[in-house]
A protein has these predicted regions:
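Small beta-barrel nucleic-acid-binding modules, primarily SNase/OB-fold domains
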Residues: 2-134
């Protein structure tokens, strides 16, 4: 267990102030395009493809959560070579969970393996975001 903790603490961390937010699960922190680990947010409008429902609410929530200083710990590189990470800020000790808890994004279980199940259950049970009225 100590070896696992040492390895987790040895993984790279990037930091930035007021990152540029692309959508509800992607931001730019310095030179790195960061995909939030375990988070799946609706896509914003791209070209002729219209925005998915709640895409801009998810983006705005991530903007709110990333005001000020942000740090992201590396998890892996995805197939697009993006830095996939677990992020925190002055506004939240766990941005990934907070976006899911808002109800505007869901857990990306294929990768997270249930790491954010509690956050998603909270969003559902309280009827937040896209869970409202369900």
């Amino acid at each position: 267990m100590l070896a696992a903790l040492a390895l987790a603490n040895a993984l790279p961390v990037i930091t930035c102030d007021a990152p540029k937010v692309h959508d509800g699960d992607t931001l730019r922190c310095g030179p790195e395009r960061v995909r939030l680990f375990g988070v799946d947010a609706p896509e914003v409008k791209r070209g002729k493809t219209p925005a998915a429902p709640f895409a801009y609410e998810a983006r705005d929530e991530l903007i709110r959560l990333t005001r000020g200083h942000v740090a992201c710990r590396f998890v892996e590189r995805d197939r697009y070579k993006r830095f996939v990470g677990k992020c925190w800020s002055n506004a939240s000790p766990d941005i990934n969970a907070a976006v899911i808890r808002s109800g505007y994004a869901t857990e990306y279980r294929r990768y997270s393996k249930g790491a954010y199940a509690k956050a998603e259950a909270e969003a559902k049970s309280t009827g937040r975001g896209h869970w409202a009225g369900r």
